[in-house]
């Protein structure tokens, strides 16, 4: 068993990183009379709305959190809000600090809310103005719960709001009187009198010696500070960007209280930590958008649409039906590859959306409960650590007939065999992106109604005598 595993690991490691290949398929003698190939199986395509997706589980945190209002000219409006708990820093300021608040010897200078950008996950036009706000949560979160993208939390008092240009991010900031080099960050500042007058600080966190308890433990802090909601206001001047931030994965994100005494200047940071609940809430509105008539179950949807629409967040998934596998003459599937082609020149599309399609696609099926789970071929590829080599699904640029096209190719050999054998009773497979909760990108694929670049299933099989 161990030796077999070593051999398999070697074979997977030597598989091409661009195109998926099934081990053994390249040694099948296609000249044998019992080995046949076909690419003419009937396929039907459509686009479907996704159910909620998981955006928080304490054992498996996201590394990036989307935030914004995006009005996509094809997909319609998408909104993402961040809800997160803050936690204490671990070291409590000296008790003298709190004793001197009521006498005025310790004074709050400003409150700075910092979030580290994850610019690699931005989608849209980052040279833009965004009205971004931080609110205090009016209800508590629970780090023992699992939260989904359709969960949300009520916003209470406004903490801070500013109009920002995300392309002009800070990499230098002042912390405790020192200028510090940081990753790209967003800084929202509540200064001077505004900070001192805010009830969170004047009545709780910066009141007098009684405030000391809220710096001692997370339990005490969460009694008075449920957490924060970060969102882009619907009134924002432009709605063509989805930003992304790092919370617990950042060394700088948090809420900083800057203060001074007659002899010292310092700060205290409330942090986002892996112990705190943190999640994103998504909303999608396709009403009136070009994509609406293509969505399964919304209009008079018919299989064989010209386009398939796939989006990150809680956005649309593609659906492929393979209804007529019975014509394959009792086959043993050697290889089955589903090929999809990126659509070009879609009317009304915008360059900075079209030119940043999804880099990796996944295929799923519905289980008995109606939940999407990945197909067997993808599960095997993940288990052996060879996603693109064994399953594929990565975006590949190639030239066919002197035309540059972008394609995704995915192995579905095991899944197709299970369909033929009756193990899988549904003829549907669903197309989505990897790490959907952390991506706002989207792809438009030519559907089965396209005359040239329709999805194609290339199958090589042996007739089972």
Segments (PLM) and residue ranges:
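Secreted, disulfide-rich extracellular signaling modules
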Residues: 2-465
């Amino acid at each position: 068993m161990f030796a077999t595993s070593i051999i398999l690991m070697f074979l997977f490691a030597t598989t091409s990183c661009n195109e998926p290949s099934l081990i053994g398929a390249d040694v099948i003698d296609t000249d044998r009379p019992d080995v046949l190939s076909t690419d003419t199986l009937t396929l039907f395509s459509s686009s479907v709305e996704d159910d909620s997706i998981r955006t928080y589980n304490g054992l498996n945190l996201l590394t990036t959190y989307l935030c914004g209002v995006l009005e996509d000219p094809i997909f319609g409006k998408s909104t993402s809000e961040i809800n997160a708990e803050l936690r204490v820093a671990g070291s409590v300021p000296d008790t003298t600090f709190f004793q001197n608040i009521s006498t005025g010897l310790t004074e709050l200078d400003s409150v700075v809310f910092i979030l580290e950008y994850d610019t690699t996950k931005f989608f849209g036009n980052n040279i833009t103005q965004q009205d971004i706000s931080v609110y205090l949560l009016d209800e508590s979160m629970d780090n023992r719960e699992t939260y989904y993208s359709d969960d949300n939390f009520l916003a209470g008092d406004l903490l801070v709001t500013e109009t920002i240009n995300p392309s002009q991010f800070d990499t230098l900031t002042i912390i405790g009187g020192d200028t510090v080099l940081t990753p790209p960050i967003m800084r929202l500042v509540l200064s001077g009198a505004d900070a001192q007058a805010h009830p969170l600080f004047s009545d709780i966190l910066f009141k007098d010696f009684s405030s000391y308890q809220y710096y001692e433990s997370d339990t005490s802090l969460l009694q008075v500070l449920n957490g924060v909601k970060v969102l882009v206001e619907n009134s924002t001047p432009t709605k063509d960007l989805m930003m992304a931030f790092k919370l617990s994965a950042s060394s700088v994100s948090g809420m900083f209280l800057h203060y001074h005494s007659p002899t010292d200047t310092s700060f205290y940071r409330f942090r986002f930590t892996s112990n705190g609940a943190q999640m994103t809430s998504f909303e999608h509105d396709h009403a009136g958008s070009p994509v609406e008539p293509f969505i399964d179950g919304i209009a008079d949807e018919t299989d064989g649409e010209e386009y398939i629409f796939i989006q990150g967040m809680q956005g649309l998934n593609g659906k492929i039906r393979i209804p007529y596998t019975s014509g394959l003459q009792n086959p043993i599937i050697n290889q089955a590859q589903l090929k999809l082609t990126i659509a070009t020149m879609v009317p009304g599309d915008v360059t900075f959306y079209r030119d940043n399609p999804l880099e990796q696609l996944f295929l799923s099926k519905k289980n008995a409960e109606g939940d999407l789970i990945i197909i067997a071929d993808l599960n095997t590829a993940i288990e052996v650590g060879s996603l693109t080599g064994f399953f594929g699904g990565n975006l590949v640029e190639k030239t066919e007939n002197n035309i540059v096209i972008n394609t995704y190719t995915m192995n579905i050999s095991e899944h197709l065999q299970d369909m033929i054998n009756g193990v899988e009773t549904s003829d549907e497979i669903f197309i989505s992106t990897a790490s959907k909760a952390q991506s706002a990108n989207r792809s438009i694929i030519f559907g089965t109604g396209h005359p040239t670049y329709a999805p194609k299933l290339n199958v090589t099989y042996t007739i089972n005598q």
